[in-house]
């Protein structure tokens, strides 16, 4: 059930950013792609997915990460939310799961 939430967040992020699924799960360090992944980690953590679950779901998509980048990504987005009030509106839209 939680994997459905993970996948819905990815769909929302890809639609919002215009990124391809292939780019999203690539090893790219492009700022836009990294921020999209960090946003996914943040959304998942706020919905109760553990770091281990996020790591497993990323691996299911051939994107192998250790846990520190996931927790770091969550903290980055939390910091950005404190600085950018418009970002909260984007996060709210991305967090909608049917």
Enumerate the predicted regions with their spans.
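General nucleic-acid-binding
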Residues: 1-11, 94
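DNA major-groove recognition helix of helix-turn-helix
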Residues: 45, 70-81
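N-terminal alpha-helical segment
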Residues: 6, 34-37, 70
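Short, amphipathic alpha-helical "recognition" segments used to contact nucleic acids or chromatin
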Residues: 33-49
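Short Lys/Arg-enriched helix C-cap and helix-to-coil transition segments
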Residues: 79-98
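Short, Lys/Arg-enriched anionic-surface-contact patches
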Residues: 12-37, 65
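Short, basic interhelical loop/turn and adjoining N-cap
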Residues: 50-52, 56-72
